[in-house]
């Protein structure tokens, strides 16, 4: 059967309606608790950038599980976040059971296999539903597990999975995830892969595309610019989506809002900057959300 997919461009009018309105009596527990696991001793900055984006996107609470070498720097740069040593197995298991949103991958590294196994098994046995974003090294570890037909991963990446999973690959990561069998320009085959995996796919590129399980619509983001071609942009996007996922009723709305805001802010900065830094984007998130919410469209 030939599947016909329609394309919808993300735009300011549609995005404005997704920005959550905060009641006067709102408190932090209403806006989600995010756990970010990442940042080995060499790549602590990736986790810092993801966390900065999560905090500035409005997450009620943010906890980082990272290499102990990163703790002093994170305490200094991100006093809003809580921190834990990722070698504390019991604490990580308890935190996964406690939070609403889990982001794994920024700066995680490919050799941290024991922690990856712990995360997989804890998620699989979790008693509550999570919104899970897998980014960067987590995608490469996921691809390796799929190639080896890892049973836990096969159960997690299925339509029957209780969790809502978001995958954020760029072109190279997508080749590994799909084992090179699904070209990035074969949209019908990508949609079929997404339907079977039961996961939302953000296929990053010059025009980022969002695929949703069992939907016949591809959401396309036309924004972005060459000034954003710098390390940490993906970490920042993943952090933004994590922060928004705890605030919105629909996970796909958090994805659309995060993807749009990321490039929208980047395009604004690019008007006056040759290079757009991820930290610049994060700092402008609260201002831009307020600005858009007040616009007359």
Predicted stretch roles:
Residues 1-28:
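Positively charged, low-complexity intrinsically disordered leader regions
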Residues 2-12, 63-223, 290-297:
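Glycine-rich phosphate/dinucleotide-binding loop and adjoining beta-alpha-beta core of small-molecule
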Residues 23-88:
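Substrate-binding N-lobe of the ribokinase-like
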Residues 23-30, 42-43, 224-241, 251, ...:
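Short glycine/threonine-rich catalytic loop with a Thr-x-Gly-x-Asp
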Residues 29-36, 215-227:
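Glycine/charged-rich beta-loop-alpha catalytic/anionic-binding loops adjacent to active sites
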Residues 42-57, 63, 112-114, 139-142, ...:
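Short glycine/serine/threonine-rich phosphate/pyrophosphate-binding segments
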Residues 61, 245-258, 267-272:
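Phosphate-handling active-site elements
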Residues 264-297:
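Charged C-terminal helix
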């Amino acid at each position: 059967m030939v599947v016909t997919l329609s394309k919808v461009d993300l735009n300011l009018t549609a995005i404005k309606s997704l920005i959550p309105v905060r009641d006067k009596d709102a408190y932090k527990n209403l806006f989600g608790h995010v756990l970010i696991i990442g940042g080995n001793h060499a790549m602590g900055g990736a986790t810092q950038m993801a966390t900065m984006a999560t905090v500035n996107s409005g997450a009620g609470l943010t906890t980082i599980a990272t290499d102990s070498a990163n703790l002093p720097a994170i305490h200094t740069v991100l006093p809003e976040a809580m921190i834990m040593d990722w070698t504390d197995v019991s604490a990580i298991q308890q935190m996964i059971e406690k939070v609403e949103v889990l982001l794994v991958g920024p700066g995680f590294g490919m050799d941290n296999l024991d922690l990856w196994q712990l995360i997989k098994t804890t998620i699989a046995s979790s008693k509550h539903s999570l919104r899970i974003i897998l980014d960067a090294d987590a995608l490469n570890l996921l691809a390796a597990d799929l190639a080896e037909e890892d049973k836990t991963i096969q159960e997690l990446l299925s339509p029957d999975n209780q969790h809502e999973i978001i995958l954020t690959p760029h072109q190279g990561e997508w080749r590994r995830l799909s084992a090179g069998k699904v070209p990035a320009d074969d949209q019908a085959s990508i949609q079929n892969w997404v339907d079977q995996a039961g996961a939302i796919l953000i296929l990053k590129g010059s025009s980022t595309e969002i695929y949703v399980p069992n939907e016949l619509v591809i959401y396309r983001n036309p924004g972005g610019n060459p000034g954003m071609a710098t390390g940490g942009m993906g970490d920042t996007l993943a952090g933004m989506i994590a922060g928004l996922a705890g605030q919105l009723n629909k996970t796909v709305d958090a994805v659309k809002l995060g993807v749009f805001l990321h490039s929208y802010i980047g395009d604004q900065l690019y008007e006056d900057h040759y290079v757009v830094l991820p930290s610049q984007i994060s700092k402008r998130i609260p201002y831009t959300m307020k600005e858009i919410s007040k616009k007359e469209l």
